[in-house]
Amino acid sequence: MRFGHFDDQNKEYVITTPQTPLPWINYLGSEDFFSLVSNTAGGYSFYRDARLRRLTRYRYNSSPLDMDGHHIYIKDGDTVWNPGWQPTKTELDSYTCRHGLGYTILEGRKNGVTAQQELFVPKGDACELDRLTLRNDSGTEKELDVFSYVAVSYTHLRAHETELH
């Protein structure tokens, strides 16, 4: 099965299905701040030291599940979905993930609404930025509820290794 392709012009790897065998990760970073972002918006962020200064929660032994991360939820009527498919796993009408040099763009489409989530770490700043762009091509007016979720950790790796799973 083919999961994506290289876009040489834009210097990106384009993933065309969220259901890859394992999370496909892009490493984003500046001098001090780093984020690892998967093709379904999973991953984690840390400041200088991934073991001692992790900012968001991530369990290494759960990595095939890829549930913790940088998630955007969109509620359209009774349907809740994510541009990166996880964690709701709501079937999308279309999906792409573009892992580029210093950024990841996830784009999902559901019921005429396209959501594009761009994640990047700006050079010289110790932060991650998420930019969400919504477009309604459904032909009807929509009222959407949109919210983001990230599991904040402020802990070190040893604390997560001793948790019960």
Question: Language-model features: where?
Answer:
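Beta-strand-rich N-terminal accessory domains
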Residues: M1-D66
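Structured core elements
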Residues: V14, Y27, L36-V37, Y73, ...
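Active-site-proximal structural scaffolding
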Residues: T17-P21, L65, C97-H99, D125-C127, ...
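Short acidic-glycine loop/turn motifs at beta-strand connectors
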Residues: S30-E31, N39-A41, D76-G77, N136-G139
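Catalytic and substrate-binding clefts that recognize carbohydrates or anionic sugar/phosphate headgroups
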Residues: Y44, R48-T96
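Extended, loop-rich substrate-binding clefts of extracytoplasmic carbohydrate-active enzymes
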Residues: G77-C127
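Acidic, contiguous internal or C-terminal segments within carbohydrate-active enzymes
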Residues: K110-Y154
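Conserved small/polar residues in nucleotide/adenosyl-binding loops
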Residues: T155-L164
